[in-house]
Amino acid sequence: MAPQPTMTDVGASSANGTRGAAGRPCPADLSPSGKLDAMTDAAAAKSAIASSLPAKPRIFSGIQPTGRPHLGNDLGAIRNYVALQDQYESIYCIVDYHALTHVHDPETLRRQTLEMAAALIALGLDPERCTLFVQSDRPEVTELCWLFNTVTPVGWLQRTPTFKEKRQTQPDDVNHGLLTYPVLQAADIVIYKASLVPIGKDQAPHLELSREIVRAFNSRYGETFPEPQPVYTQAPVVLGTDGTRKMSKSIGNTIEVLAEPDVIRKQIMSMVTDTQRILRSDPGRPQVCNVCQLHRHFGEDYEEIWDGERTARTGCVDTKKLLAERIIAHYAPARETYKELMADPARLRRILDEGAERIRPIAEATMTEVRERMGLR
């Protein structure tokens, strides 16, 4: 995969100076020639930043490495990612650093990271049309997170709903990473100078905190980062098989779209439907039946199916069976692609490595600019 023209690489070293990690001057660069090297570095950084400005607006989204995604993940987020990759310069990151706040087994994290990468590609993300990489493969973001910590009041972080809820419900599993989670989120977005973030309206408060952190940094050190703007997506809230709560692996109410067909059938046949429809002859209420609602996404004839429920021409079992077969057929190509990718982890790792390398110049140029503004060079 050739790097995109808007992400032109720049030299990691100056014309005459010795370079250390992340392109920073080594201690030996203290002579007059070292000062010249520093000036060259500054010019190179400005050039890198200019060359990394995208021809199309740049969009960023982070994705938790939870393993194979379920139906709610696809309908609620992944389908939007696929659509956006042609409208924007799209950067998608599997956020394994974030996952460390709750996933503590190394092998589980490695496996779930690769599973999510394979699933995203199988479901339509094209590494030639977007950048897909793993968060920890660009460690510059952790440095920016620390620097953002120095401009972020603790009170902002303590008021976040996720932290407050976890502190009340699981006080023994609250760590510093959970508290500073929003700071790393802000760093994730702006280290690549992304100006847009795809979110549902319920996620607006999370993005607003990222914007506050960016404003705090820009106010103290000068205009450095764009304030990320939301791109509101039409993402449905997909209820789980219990019919009452949002589909979630932690609850165990999911439909695993990349699982084997028999597994999908079993999960769909277990779905709760209209609780007021007791007998086969009772009329149904498709507007409250989760099975009927899901038919909207897997066939243009859903209104006909709904009418069958209202008039009791169709039973709940029939409606479930039809939904199961449609979901199995819809995801069959993705299921095969997923299996092929998981059978060749070296190929999958190569795709992720190429994504991380593609955005390396942007991350390095951003950190050069940030260090200079903060007096660290």
Positions of predicted regions on the chain:
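N-terminal Rossmann-like or analogous alpha/beta NTP/dinucleotide-binding catalytic cores
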Residues: 36, 40-187, 335, 339
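Conserved nucleotide- and phosphate/pyrophosphate-binding catalytic cores
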Residues: 71, 205, 211-377
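Intrinsic low-complexity, disordered N-terminal segments enriched in polar/charged/small residues
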Residues: 4-6
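Short helix-capping/linker segments at secondary-structure and domain boundaries
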Residues: 152-158, 191-198, 298-306, 335
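Structured ligand/cofactor/substrate-binding pocket environments in proteins
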Residues: 69-78, 82, 91, 95-96, ...
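Short, positively charged and aromatic/hydrophobic N-terminal segments
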Residues: 9, 15, 29-38
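Divalent metal-coordination and catalytic microenvironments
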Residues: 120, 148, 202, 294, ...
